[in-house]
Amino acid sequence: MLYTKHINLTDATETTMFTVPTGFHIIIYYVFIANHAGSTKTASLHFAESDGSNRVDIFDAENVSGGGRLTLDSGGGPMFVLHEGEVVKAQTEASSDMEFVVTFDLLEMPPSLVNFV
């Protein structure tokens, strides 16, 4: 089943959007970031293991103009697979009004894959 997680950030605090639940993995299909502020602000989005290791930066302090948007998709196919316990985090800068949206499929892990990761 597809889910969309949405957060709105207004300060520079790194915020966890979601953590992949135990026994599941997710396939990310779409990422959308919108800057609702009047001036250019930076946006960062990454995923990593719960302890912060194996971090992958999707957007790393990417400039988004006032009223601008960033999108990342693969034409409807999967982009990233995350496993149980991995987290997706977003961050912007102070005095921002930045919207982060991630659409993903949440799938139960088959018993044969539980020890694979």
Walk through the language-model features, giving the residues of each.
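C-terminal interaction-tip segments
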Residues: 1-26, 30, 36, 84, ...
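Beta-strand-rich interaction surfaces with strong enrichment in secreted/lumenal proteins
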Residues: 4-7, 59-62, 77-79, 89
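Extracellular carbohydrate recognition and processing domains
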Residues: 7-13, 63-73
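Short beta-strand segments
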Residues: 16, 41, 56-57, 70, ...
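Short, surface-exposed beta-strand/strand-loop-strand elements in extracellular ectodomains
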Residues: 38-61
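Short conserved beta-strand and strand-loop elements enriched in small hydrophobics
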Residues: 46, 88-91
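Beta-sandwich interaction modules
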Residues: 67-85
